[in-house]
Amino acid sequence: MTWRSEHIWIELITGSRKISNFCWAFILFLGSLGFLLVGTSSYLGRNLISFFPPQQIIFFPQGLVMSFYGIAGLFISSYLWCTISWNVGSGYDRFDRKEGIVCIFRWGFPGKNRRIFLRFLIKDIQSVRIEVKEGISARRVLYMDIRGQGSIPLTRTDENLTPREIEQKAAELAYFLRVPIEVF
């Protein structure tokens, strides 16, 4: 979502609370829970899941491996649920021409650097850069080059923008900030 006026441009950044992350976390949780139940069923010799009799899967090595996969999947699923609940990666980009300041804010993982806040002067911005990598895993990322600081990504790497969309976004931002555009 973007909000613009004559002097201020604010762009809200979606973090890890995306539908795809919810789906993957839910599917991974259910799958790993199933693996763990099958492994536990084979260990106990009881039918905890009614799909098959427990005698079909012996505990060593199949049940043990399935239990391991179930536990590993639960750890990965809990990691995904934590990143979703903490909304890692969300934040905003604020470009203020009146004050001459650019503020970039992102939420990180809990701890010392939970809040990531970067502040730059607009006069230190050298250019808005588009990096394009074509091929099987095509990638188009918009960067802001800061004098003495390097490049700061303004779009997510998994945000699959069309060439037209990324060009339009770069052109609008470069026009707003009054800086040149570079394409790599």
From Swiss-Prot:
- Record-annotated membrane-spanning stretches: 21-43, 58-80
Q: Name one Pfam family in it.
A: Ycf4
Q: Which GO terms describe its cellular component?
A: chloroplast thylakoid membrane; photosystem I
One GO biological-process annotation of the entry reads: photosynthesis
Q: Which chain positions lie within coiled-coil regions?
A: none
State where the protein is found: Plastid, Chloroplast thylakoid membrane
Q: Fetch the InterPro entries from UniProt.
A: PSI_Ycf4_assembly
Q: How does it sit in the membrane?
A: Multi-pass membrane protein
Keywords, in A-Z order: Chloroplast, Membrane, Photosynthesis, Plastid, Thylakoid, Transmembrane, Transmembrane helix
Q: What does this protein do?
A: Seems to be required for the assembly of the photosystem I complex.
Q: What family is this protein classified in?
A: Belongs to the Ycf4 family.
> Could you identify this protein by its name?
Photosystem I assembly protein Ycf4
Q: Which organism is it from?
A: Nicotiana tabacum (Common tobacco)
Q: Which gene encodes it?
A: ycf4
